[in-house]
Amino acid sequence: MAIAIGLDFGSDSVRALAVECRTGQEIATSVEWYPRWQEGRYCDAPNNQFRHHPRDYIESMEAAIKTVLAELSEEQRAQIVGIGVDSTGSTPAPVDAEGRVLALRPEFADNPNAMFVLWKDHTAVEEAEAITRLCHQPGKADYSRYIGGIYSSEWFWAKILHVTRADPAVAQAAVSWIELCDWVPALLSGTTRPQDIRRGRCSAGHKSLWHESWGGLPPAAFFDELDPIINQSLKYPLFTDTFTADIPVGTLNEEWARRLGLPQNVAISGGAFDCHMGAVGAGAQPNTLVKVIGTSTCDILTADKATVGDRAVKGICGQVDGSVVPDFIGLEAGQSAFGDIYAWFGRVLGWPLDQLAATHPELKPQIDASKKQLLPQLTEAWAKNPSLDHLPVVLDWFNGRRTPFANQRLKGVITDLNLATDAPALFGGLIAATAFGARAIMECFTEQGIAVNEVMALGGIARKNQVIMQACCDVLNRPLQIVASDQCCALGAAIFAAVAAGVHADIPTAQQHMASAVENTLQPRAQQAQRFEQLYQRYLQWSKSAEQHYLPVATPAKTSAEKPATLTH
């Protein structure tokens, strides 16, 4: 027997999962919430700032692994062969010469700019737009060619430029920046120094403008033209080589072996983004669109290199050789908000209840119980009477739009209301909106010649809310496979750990032994699909019209060229 542990670093918590490598049996699992994040520290939601303190990751990871190990027998603990890591992304942080995230140093302990900039942080909209403009200058190389043609404020270089401009102290102290999914394996293996870190193909290819065809990162002149402050503060290039996640970065170092009570020969596999590993954990095959559904969605599809050819798919979040499965092109898309939209509506409806609880504390237990039932009751009420002929049409841009064609300036829009629109109908409109966003992504692939043969959904919403999933199935007008495991991302990380440890020869072989089964396959209902088709066309019309209201206002180019002094470390 051999056991692998998968670590899945999400937006709110980290999950550890122990998996038997020959059978795929999920033996033990634990979820630990990030304590500082739970307190709302280092975030400024109205200004789209969301930061994670590295100690949240370290403390929660250690607790989660120890809880899992406590559930294993002594014999099972001795059979642990590898640890794999996935995380949200792009979630980068500035590090010093030893690879310490700056927030781990006393002088930066409470500085949000010295922490991990969470994927959904949208403080770098202007910087992202500047990168996109530079990529599209006539007569120059387009370094956005393989990331969909638009650089997002959620991504690596936009965040680096924003923080470097905003915080000279951080810019002075930072020797490099690193993605969370690369930092955790480096931490566990003791390879955190910038020159020792193995950069993952997944994060580098999808978020950092890295591509083999131009030798890695864009040339130094590209960053000089974007803003000289980047090359003044960071040594060019930050990195050159990248590695697929099946390649081990090392083994458990002495400190972490002691802290966890594990031997130092435990292999540490390379890191990747959560949804890419989730697709592997789901057992997805080429040309299967995998929707990893949570607060937002990430949509993953793999395709044979020969099928993709030299085609550059526009409007997505990148196409990268080996970002999901080695030797296949991994294509990424996603919705900036899915479950977050439902949660927003729950907060809106819950506001009067909060006020009542504040004035009548004795009622708080009953009020809290009622609030928990708001969304389930709305779902049930809408399912009984969906009234598709009178459904509000909603644009699902409550947190901007990731795909198709990223635009984080966009806002949610609700249309077609009348005096008969009640709470269940409005909630139904939100459900339909998230389904319409899913279809727009699928069509972004198919209309550019990338076949979608099957569609899979995974995650808590996929398994627990059939009403929402059936609406997605009807809108897509495709069978929708619901994956059995609700921890596919951690399962995928464990699969990569098993390959890195040598238990399986490659990822496809490991998937045959370890990947999740399909729990249920939903079928589209003809009548509902026909009505949703009409609503989807309305959604497209409103999308085209509304987007014009969020065009950026022309401003002089922002640059730090007036500060030419080179920063030293």
Curated annotation (Swiss-Prot):
An example Gene Ontology CC term for this record: cytoplasm
Statement: the UniProt record of this protein carries the keyword ATP-binding: yes
EC number: 2.7.1.16
UniProtKB keywords: Arabinose catabolism, ATP-binding, Carbohydrate metabolism, Kinase, Nucleotide-binding, Transferase
Pfam families, per the entry: FGGY_C
Catalytic activity: D-ribulose + ATP = D-ribulose 5-phosphate + ADP + H(+); L-ribulose + ATP = L-ribulose 5-phosphate + ADP + H(+)
InterPro entries recorded: ATPase_NBD (IPR043129), FGGY_C (IPR018485), Ribulokinase (IPR005929)
GO molecular-function terms, A-Z: ATP binding; D-ribulokinase activity; ribulokinase activity
BP GO terms, sorted: L-arabinose catabolic process to xylulose 5-phosphate
Broadest EC class assigned to this enzyme: transferase
Keyword Nucleotide-binding among UniProt keywords: yes
Alphabetized Gene3D superfamilies for the sequence: 1.20.58.2240, 3.30.420.40
Signal peptide: none
Pathway: Carbohydrate degradation; L-arabinose degradation via L-ribulose; D-xylulose 5-phosphate from L-arabinose (bacterial route): step 2/3
Intrachain disulfide bonds: none
Family under the similarity heading: Belongs to the ribulokinase family.
Alphabetized PANTHER family for the sequence: FGGY CARBOHYDRATE KINASE DOMAIN-CONTAINING PROTEIN, RIBULOKINASE
Protein name per Swiss-Prot or TrEMBL: Ribulokinase
Organism for this UniProt entry: Enterobacter sp. (strain 638)
